[in-house]
């Protein structure tokens, strides 16, 4: 057996908007009018009954349960799948000034077994691209200019391979 890999993956973005505006956007997470999750390019985040403490859902093969829900501050999820992901991911809002808010996405987990390999060689790169796309979507909601983070070659290759795999199903 391999030793668990400790993962701390943090993305932050400063958005030139009051915290209340971003809290309103965070409250749309997984809803049809979602202002944050980039479901235009990635598997949608889905929860049958919406996001509330105890709700089960996820995106693609990644599954989690809502542990904390206060869209004015934090939404925290605990991983339930894939096997070997032991930990949480969360979105947090922090007021910097009256018109400037920091949004942070954090994964804090330990991986074990096959999940360690999958995190290192595939999921991490896809996750990083997805979160930056989500932050772009949020920022673009309030901007005249369109921000679009560029995917690196590895993300493009992984997405191409996954698209082929899905097409065969």
Please provide the spans of the model-predicted regions.
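Short beta-strand segments that buttress and anchor functional surface loops
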Residues: 50-58, 76-82
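Hydrophobic pocket/interface hotspot
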Residues: 21-32, 66, 75-77, 103-105, ...
